[in-house]
Amino acid sequence: VEPFYAIKSNPDPMILYVLSKLGSGFDCASKDEIILAKSTGVPVENLLYANPTKDQSSLQFARSQDVDYLTFDSYCELDKIKLFHPDAKCIIRIKVDDSGSECKFNSKFGCTMDEVQELLSLAKIDKINVVGISWHVGSNCKIPGQFSKAISDARKVFNIAKEMGINIEIIDCGGGFPGTDDGPI
């Protein structure tokens, strides 16, 4: 297991520097977050551009910075990747049950399980290298079983990909466990 810290959760440069020196990778959602992560000296292979909706300039920027790991959840995104970062290593983001979380993401991010096979087929036809599966149970998830359900869904995607000759090497598990609030720090 290799941690990839979501910069959006706390972009303090000192925290990022320490995490980088401890060997953490970084989950980036924007050009600015890529720049911030790279300023820590982290190797580019430890950067994931995890925003599933990227514009042309963002994809070109990622490519110019050798940031190759990208997420996608639609054919529109695959089409942009094919045009502007064709050598990317792509990670399909799936919707999972986030009903136990305070901050939900699945209404706006991730493809449904019914869309997985078609998206993987289109990626294969377009010669887009799919190397992983991503999901996010939402922030502050209070139902541990949601993680098990998400892992089960990821396994289904893994099996579909395997049948298609796609080698999945990465599973990006998103979401956070709630901590305790014992007062001010």
Q: Which residue ranges define each predicted feature?
A:
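A conserved active-site cap/scaffold subdomain adjacent to cofactor or substrate pockets
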Residues: 175-179, 184
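Active-site-proximal beta-alpha core segment in soluble small-molecule metabolic enzymes
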Residues: 2-170, 179
